[in-house]
């Protein structure tokens, strides 16, 4: 738009003598004023966002000395006064916008290039023409106010402390792309903490990235009706609650407790082994449950060989029965729950006075094979010293001790699952072939680091020097093995039970040297136990290899035991079981094995009579 020409003093008479309609000026008619207003409105609506210093430049141009002074004329018309009042209102509006923009915005001052990009249409000066404002002028001004309604509302709204707050730190007026110049006092982002006074159009995006409409009643609720805090004091308290660590929680996925917490609840209160449910008033494993039950039913009395402070855990819980029973009582196991007499056929329950009726009503899940075998080991192991023999004794007492060990070993093996399914004839052959090796394993487990004494299943403690000469070699070799036995493998009940079972099945060779009548059944039992041990040692293949190697090493005790029996046989009446053992074939289990000569010492070398398939193919 061309800049309005400045009127000279020569036109003063013309203005004074002519009507406003006859004045030859760009502002002399109502249409010219409306055209300029229309241009201004179109620029605001269609052009790029207004720069920050736009109103400052407009105010600077309007404050320059004009070519027409409204005050120079004495009797001015009402139209001139109306024009002067309108211009003054617009100037006041521009000044207010500039002041509020300077107070709120902290963006850097626009560069020289941005200043030079101001459209030329806005570099004009206000006209000093004197004319009468028609009624359409007021309508045009009202139209401008309606177009700039969001901006004007900031000054027409009642006082509110929220709108006097500082603008958001990321507010940038140059980044606005609305159809109008927004209120500088409002933040440029949509926040539930600031009331939004702009109508939401159909082209705007909702909180979920989908198009929302102002007519939609099921979309995002209006921030004016939100329950969130809408004032700075409330907002500070609202945000402060998120900064308090006490208000924050760290639950696991889907509200499920962590695995560590679940494992801690499934530990036996007596020996820290795996426990599934409550037994007799406390969470205990199956082994401690059976031990406590047998102790109460048989009214057993135990004595401690130490100072009554023996450690009770899953490795050494069978070492001292006295301390184990005392710990059962300490953790809350109740003797009254154990079934006696006529109660043996139904679940034992406490009376209403004890209020512990849920002790044994919870059924236990089925246990795996090695767990059942480990339970049999614990049920048939005695770790309590009953008598001590430090004086030398003869061969008859030695045979009585060995005979008692044989019956205890047979009872233990018959209590193990799978092994008890073997036919009696084959069971007797395998027991005779593995008896001395199994006795050495159990002695090593009972003796520990003892160097001068040995304890048997009967609870009798003997000095090494008290044994007859024919048993000295095998007994001392047992004690030597016991010194390092506990440190070779982590002997929990499952691994220890599998070790004994594999030692019992050592005579089952590929060529059936022992002459088993139902070898396929024995092969099936042996394969089942090996697979169970493989699964049990899945996290430590080294442990599996150690157990297999120890099975070969302990097989040498069979030859040592035969040497002692061969010495006693001519002069002593041997029990029937020992006679069966002596008459058992002594053919080597493998072609590389040779039977030892009678009376010759046998060194505990790595070679053995055990024909067990080593390597990955066996597992």
Swiss-Prot record:
Zinc finger (NR C4-type): 268-288, 304-328
Main subcellular location of this protein, as a coarse class: nucleus
Record GO biological process: cellular response to corticotropin-releasing hormone stimulus; positive regulation of transcription by RNA polymerase II; regulation of ovulation; regulation of transcription by RNA polymerase II; spermathecum morphogenesis
Molecular function terms from GO: DNA-binding transcription factor activity; DNA-binding transcription factor activity, RNA polymerase II-specific; nuclear glucocorticoid receptor binding; RNA polymerase II cis-regulatory region sequence-specific DNA binding; sequence-specific DNA binding; zinc ion binding
Keyword annotations from UniProtKB, A to Z: DNA-binding, Metal-binding, Nucleus, Receptor, Transcription, Transcription regulation, Zinc, Zinc-finger
UniProt cross-references to SMART domains, sorted A to Z: HOLI, ZnF_C4
DNA-binding region coordinates: 265-340
Domain NR LBD, chain residue ranges per copy: 365-600
Compartments (UniProt record): Nucleus
Bias (Basic residues): 346-356
The keyword Cell inner membrane belongs to this UniProt entry's keyword annotation: no
GO cellular component terms, semicolon-separated: nucleus; transcription regulator complex
Expression sites (tissue/organ): In hermaphrodites, expressed in the developing spermatheca and dorsal uterus. Expression includes the 8 cells of the dorsal somatic gonad primordium and the sujc cells that form the core of the spermatheca-uterine valve. Expressed in the precursor cells of the spermatheca-sheath lineages (SS cells) and in the precursors and descendents of the dorsal-uterine lineage (DU cells). In both hermaphroditic and male animals, expressed in a pair of head chemosensory neurons.
Transmembrane segment boundaries: none
InterPro entries: NHR-like_dom_sf, Nucl_hrmn_rcpt_lig-bd, Znf_hrmn_rcpt, Znf_NHR/GATA
Region ranges (Disordered): 1-29, 58-86, 103-134, 196-232, 345-365
Region span, AF-2: 589-600
Biased composition, class Low complexity, residue ranges: 19-29, 206-232
Residue ranges with Polar residues bias: 1-18, 125-134
Alphabetical list of Pfam families matching this protein: Hormone_recep, zf-C4
Domain remark in the UniProt entry: The NR LBD domain and the nuclear receptor DNA binding domain are sufficient for binding to the NGFI-B response element (NBRE) 5'-AAAGGTCA-3'.
Summary of the function given for this chain in its UniProt record: Transcriptional activator that induces gene expression by binding to the NGFI-B response element (NBRE) 5'-AAAGGTCA-3'. Required for proper morphogenesis of the spermatheca and the spermatheca-uterine valve formation. Promotes cell proliferation and differentiation of the spermatheca precursor cells during spermatheca development in larval stage L4. Might play a role in promoting G1/S phase progression in the spermatheca precursor cell lineage. Also required for the differentiation of the spermatheca-uterine junction core (sujc) cells which are generating the spermatheca-uterine valve.
Protein name: Nuclear hormone receptor family member nhr-6
Organism whose genome encodes this protein: Caenorhabditis elegans
Gene label: nhr-6
């Amino acid at each position: 738009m061309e800049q309005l020409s400045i009127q000279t003093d020569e036109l003063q008479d013309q203005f004074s003598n002519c009507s406003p309609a006859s004045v030859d000026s760009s502002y002399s008619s109502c249409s010219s004023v409306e055209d300029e207003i229309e241009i201004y409105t179109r620029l605001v609506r269609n052009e790029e966002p207004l720069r920050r210093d736009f109103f400052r430049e407009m105010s600077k141009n309007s404050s320059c000395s004009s070519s027409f002074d409204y005050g120079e004329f004495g009797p001015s018309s009402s139209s001139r006064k109306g024009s002067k009042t309108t211009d003054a209102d617009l100037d006041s509006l521009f000044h207010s916008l500039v002041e509020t923009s300077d107070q709120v915005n902290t963006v850097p001052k626009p560069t020289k290039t941005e200043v030079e990009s101001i459209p030329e249409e806005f570099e004009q000066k206000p006209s000093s023409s004197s004319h009468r404002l028609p009624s359409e002028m007021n309508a045009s001004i009202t139209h401008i106010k309606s177009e700039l309604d969001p901006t004007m509302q900031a000054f027409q709204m009642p006082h509110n402390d929220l709108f006097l707050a500082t603008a958001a730190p990321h507010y940038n007026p140059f980044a606005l792309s609305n159809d109008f110049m927004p209120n500088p006092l409002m933040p440029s982002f949509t926040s539930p903490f600031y009331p939004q006074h702009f109508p939401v159009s159909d082209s705007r995006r909702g909180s979920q990235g989908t198009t929302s409409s102002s007519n939609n009643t099921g979309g995002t609720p209006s921030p004016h009706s939100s329950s969130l805090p809408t004032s700075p004091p409330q907002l500070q308290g609202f945000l402060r609650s998120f900064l308090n660590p006490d208000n924050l929680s760290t639950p696991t996925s889907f509200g499920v407790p962590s695995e560590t917490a679940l494992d801690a609840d499934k530990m036996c209160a007596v020996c820290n082994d795996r426990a599934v449910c409550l037994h007799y008033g406390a969470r205990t494993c199956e082994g401690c449950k059976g031990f406590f039950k047998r102790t109460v039913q048989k009214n057993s009395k135990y004595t401690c060989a130490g100072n009554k402070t023996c450690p009770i855990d899953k490795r050494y819980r069978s070492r001292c029965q006295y301390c184990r029973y005392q710990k059962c009582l300490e953790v809350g196991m109740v003797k009254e729950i154990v079934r006696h007499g006529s109660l043996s056929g139904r679940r034992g329950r406490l009376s209403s006075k004890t209020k512990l009726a849920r002790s044994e009503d919870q059924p236990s899940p089925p246990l795996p094979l090695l767990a059942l075998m480990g339970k049999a080991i614990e049920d048939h192991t005695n770790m309590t010293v009953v008598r001590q023999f430090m004086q030398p004794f003869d061969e008859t007492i030695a045979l009585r001790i060995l005979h008692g060990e044989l019956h205890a070993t047979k009872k233990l093996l018959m209590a193990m699952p799978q092994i008890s399914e073997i036919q009696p004839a084959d069971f007797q052959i395998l027991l005779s072939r593995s008896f001395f090796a199994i006795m050495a394993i159990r002695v090593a487990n009972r003796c520990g680091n003892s160097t001068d004494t040995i304890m048997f299943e009967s609870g009798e403690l003997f000095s090494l020097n008290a044994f007859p000469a024919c048993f000295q070699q095998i007994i001392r070799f047992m004690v030597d093995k016991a010194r390092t036995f506990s440190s070779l493998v982590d002997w929990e009940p499952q691994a220890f039970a599998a070790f004994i079972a594999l030692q019992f099945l050592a005579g089952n060779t590929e060529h059936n040297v022992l002459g088993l009548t139902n070898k396929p059944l024995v092969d099936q039992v042996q394969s089942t136990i090996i697979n169970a041990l493989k699964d049990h040692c899945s996290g430590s293949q080294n442990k599996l290899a150690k157990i297999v190697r120890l099975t070969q090493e302990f097989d040498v005790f069979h030859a040592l035991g035969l040497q002692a029996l061969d010495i006693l046989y001519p002069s002593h009446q041997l029990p029937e079981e020992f006679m069966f053992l002596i008459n058992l074939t002594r053919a080597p289990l493998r072609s590389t094995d040779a039977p030892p000569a009678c009376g010759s010492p046998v060194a505990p070398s790595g070679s053995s009579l055990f024909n067990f398939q080593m390597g990955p193919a066996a597992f």
